[in-house]
């Protein structure tokens, strides 16, 4: 009798197949590591794909310098424990201009420090394929993106000029200067991610678990007071509104642009139970998603992941 795979094992097998395909097809792949839960799952799958050997490609963090401090500590610990070949890139032009999310706004900050920073790094190291942890259930522009997402020589995405993907057959042919973004987790849901993290014992950033944290409510979003830099951009009236609440994060990005959610979920089973009952998007707290109508698709057209 043929054993039947659970849906998580089917997703795992599909993702491992995609990762191995890219490693075999492309000359210089890289795995982007944003330190979040999806990156944690993708990295775990990649290590499984090539176990007991080491990853045949580096991992890269495009650093905006505005991530949560706990994210940086977690990244450094994972690199040391797993022996990862980590590349960290910060856009030097953005640093020279003093780009930050407070003075320049979320759209400018994201474009310079994330999109342009990513394009710089891909060009600098000549990567022809880059793994990312995006999923189709996250956001509508990602829902129509292929597993192999083709980009032109300027790293731009044209949703009308993508190749068909039949079953598990992927066309990796690219011209000189072109590249692909690869999404092994395309068919996973947020609930799948949490269930897999629980079953596999994958370490994640503690910010995903509820705890008492200092936050301020700005435009309906709970922003965590992560370091002293945010205080420089708050008025005395705003500082007086800082309070401690029991919160956690469903998604992690630059801390001034990422909202927390009120929650009492302090364990993985409690988070999974919360996911079964929630009726809101995990990206509701991402300020960059609300810059304008269709902003995520426009960012992706310009080279954003």
Swiss-Prot record:
Signal peptide: none annotated. One of its GO terms (biological process) is hydrogen sulfide biosynthetic process. Pathway: Sulfur metabolism; hydrogen sulfide biosynthesis; sulfite from sulfate: step 1/3. Its EC number is 2.7.7.4. Keywords: ATP-binding, Nucleotide-binding, Nucleotidyltransferase, Transferase. One of its GO terms (molecular function) is ATP binding. Pfam families: PAPS_reduct (PF01507). It catalyses: sulfate + ATP + H(+) = adenosine 5'-phosphosulfate + diphosphate. It comes from the Bacteria. It is an enzyme of class 2 (transferase). Gene3D superfamilies: HUPs. InterPro entries: PAPS_reduct_dom, Rossmann-like_a/b/a_fold, SO4_adenylTrfase_ssu, Sulfate_adenylyltrnsfr_sub2. CDD domains: Sulfate_adenylyltransferase_2. Heterodimer composed of CysD, the smaller subunit, and CysNC. With CysN forms the ATP sulfurylase (ATPS) that catalyzes the adenylation of sulfate producing adenosine 5'-phosphosulfate (APS) and diphosphate, the first enzymatic step in sulfur assimilation pathway. APS synthesis involves the formation of a high-energy phosphoric-sulfuric acid anhydride bond driven by GTP hydrolysis by CysN coupled to ATP hydrolysis by CysD. Belongs to the PAPS reductase family. CysD subfamily. This is Sulfate adenylyltransferase subunit 2. It comes from Pseudomonas aeruginosa (strain ATCC 15692 / DSM 22644 / CIP 104116 / JCM 14847 / LMG 12228 / 1C / PRS 101 / PAO1).
